[in-house]
Amino acid sequence: MIRLAAIDVDGTLTDRDRLISTKAIESIRSAEKKGLTVSLLSGNVIPVVYALKIFLGINGPVFGENGGIMFDNDGSIKKFFSNEGTNKFLEEMSKRTSMRSILTNRWREASTGFDIDPEDVDYVRKEAESRGFVIFYSGYSWHLMNRGEDKAFAVNKLKEMYSLEYDEILVIGDSNNDMPMFQLPVRKACPANATDNIKAVSDFVSDYSYGEEIGQIFKHFELM
């Protein structure tokens, strides 16, 4: 029996313009009323996921920066990684490449966001990996992360917090940066707009996209 759903935000609950699906909100609230714990896992910053938790009524902890930091139900913020090294890397690379800071870095605590011109991506990726960092593009922003800082880390943290088995957890996501949590032995589902890699490892692929899929997924797994 599934007891917890860990859900990505951009492209999973939102459309191409990053507007949240009202149908997704209704489905989440219906499932929560039946006892499901819902957690959001986003690449965005804590102020954003905190606001989503409060205004959408999410009943579980929410994670920002792809699992690097969490806002818990007791009102505390728990930081699992540092951005000291990633910020220094950005500062260094910005002097030699087109890698440059973005607005949301003023709120980031566990990772670093950036923009970059396409011709510099391979070089910066190799430099990052040689120093124990990982870079990826979420479809909305470039992220510079510490190794091991990903959504699988967040799901494992939830598993520990709620004393769950993997088969009691459902993950829902749409893009390749969700893949770490899809590689865990959990239940997996995705919207129709998901990447082929995510679809290939999903237990259920919805006919609907951009948040409209949440109700169908929850019904498939008998959560509402």
Curated annotation (Swiss-Prot):
Binding site for Mg(2+) 1: 8, 174-175, 178
Active-site residues, as the UniProt record annotates them: 8 (nucleophile)
Entry's cofactor comment: Binds 5 Mg(2+) ions per homodimer.
GO cellular component, one term: cytosol
Record comment: activity regulation: Inhibited by Ca(2+) ions and by high chloride ion concentration. By contrast, low chloride concentration (up to 50 mM) slightly activate the enzyme.
Residue positions binding Mg(2+) 3: 10, 43
Catalytic activity: 2-phosphoglycolate + H2O = glycolate + phosphate
Record EC number: 3.1.3.18
Cofactor: Mg(2+)
UniProt keyword annotation of Hydrolase present: yes
Residues the record lists as binding Mg(2+) 2: 11, 174
Positions with a binding annotation for substrate: 151
UniProt keyword list: Carbohydrate metabolism, Hydrolase, Magnesium, Metal-binding
Family assignment from sequence similarity: Belongs to the HAD-like hydrolase superfamily. Archaeal SPP-like hydrolase family.
Role summary: Catalyzes the dephosphorylation of 2-phosphoglycolate. Also has significant, but less efficient, pyrophosphatase activity, since it is able to catalyze the release of phosphate from inorganic pyrophosphate (PPi).
Oligomeric form and interacting partners: Homodimer.
Stated name of the protein: Phosphoglycolate phosphatase
Organism of derivation: Thermoplasma acidophilum (strain ATCC 25905 / DSM 1728 / JCM 9062 / NBRC 15155 / AMRC-C165)
